[in-house]
Amino acid sequence: MIDNNKHNQDINASSANTIKKDELSESACKIDSIIDPKDDQIIQLQIQLAQIKEHERNTILRLKAEIENIQRRNIQEIEKAHKFALDRFVSELLPVIDNLERTLGIIDRSNTTLSAIIEGIDLTLKSFLDTVYKFGVKSIHEIHIPFNPEIHQAISTMESEKYESNQVLTIVQKGYSLNGRLVRPAMVIVAKSKS
């Protein structure tokens, strides 16, 4: 009877195990059928998330590049502003330079009573020019060079056998540039060939 009971218990345990295994496998199938659509949805969401992250990363990179470009342009504009802030000031100083040069050109240097005044004007002009040259001002005063409409303004032409046509013969009024930018063109007389 003990053997029978043991045998019955084994059979009962075995059939209980089989029933549990069947139930588990049915549950697993149900879970699989439940999980599968959710897995697909999870995968789709992960793909969308990756795309959004990539788009966001690209947007951030683009914005960083745009910010760097704006900063670079601002720095360049500030440099230009510093470089050419003196433009108007230099334009106002040019008539003073012209007047000092004209004075030295017409004054009688042989008059000994004026020698101290002449020397004072000469030193003043030299000091004044040295000062403006320190700030990037350059004079345009070369003669016997080809006429350049970017830096010269022809006010007259003169026939010449000695110089080629379109050569600068005389500077009537010096021109000036500030850091490579023209402030005032040089007023010149240009050679033309004899007809």
UniProtKB/Swiss-Prot annotation:
Keywords: Chaperone, Cytoplasm, Stress response. GO terms for cellular component: cytosol. It is found in: Cytoplasm. CDD domains: GrpE. Signal peptide: none annotated. Gene3D superfamilies: 3.90.20.20, Head domain of nucleotide exchange factor GrpE. One of its GO terms (molecular function) is protein-folding chaperone binding. InterPro entries: GrpE, GrpE_coiled_coil, GrpE_head. GO terms for biological process: protein folding. It comes from the Bacteria. Its main location: cytoplasm. The keyword Cytoplasm applies. Participates actively in the response to hyperosmotic and heat shock by preventing the aggregation of stress-denatured proteins, in association with DnaK and GrpE. It is the nucleotide exchange factor for DnaK and may function as a thermosensor. Unfolded proteins bind initially to DnaJ; upon interaction with the DnaJ-bound protein, DnaK hydrolyzes its bound ATP, resulting in the formation of a stable complex. GrpE releases ADP from DnaK; ATP binding to DnaK triggers the release of the substrate protein, thus completing the reaction cycle. PANTHER family: GRPE PROTEIN, GRPE PROTEIN HOMOLOG, MITOCHONDRIAL. Belongs to the GrpE family. Homodimer. This is Protein GrpE.
